[in-house]
From Swiss-Prot:
PANTHER family: H_ACA RIBONUCLEOPROTEIN COMPLEX SUBUNIT 3 (PTHR13305:SF0), RIBOSOME BIOGENESIS PROTEIN NOP10 (PTHR13305). It comes from Trypanosoma cruzi. Residues 18-40 are annotated as: Disordered. This is H/ACA ribonucleoprotein complex subunit 3-like protein. Its main location: nucleus. One of its GO terms (cellular component) is box H/ACA snoRNP complex. Belongs to the NOP10 family. It comes from the Eukaryota. The keyword Chaperone does not apply.
Amino acid sequence: MHLQVYIVNGKRQYTLKKMDPEGKPTLSAHPARFSPDDKYSRHRITIKRRFKALKSEKRPKPL
């Protein structure tokens, strides 16, 4: 059995079931595996930089 999660009113609800009470499939509550041999990290960083989605490039909010 794996821990599953579904969203209710913007909050996470954890369960062991594969379906939520509404009949929708639940999602895995575990993060994806980390691989030091990540072949696509360069491409992800390029795309995030292009669309200014990197956390280090967030602009401060104006006062």
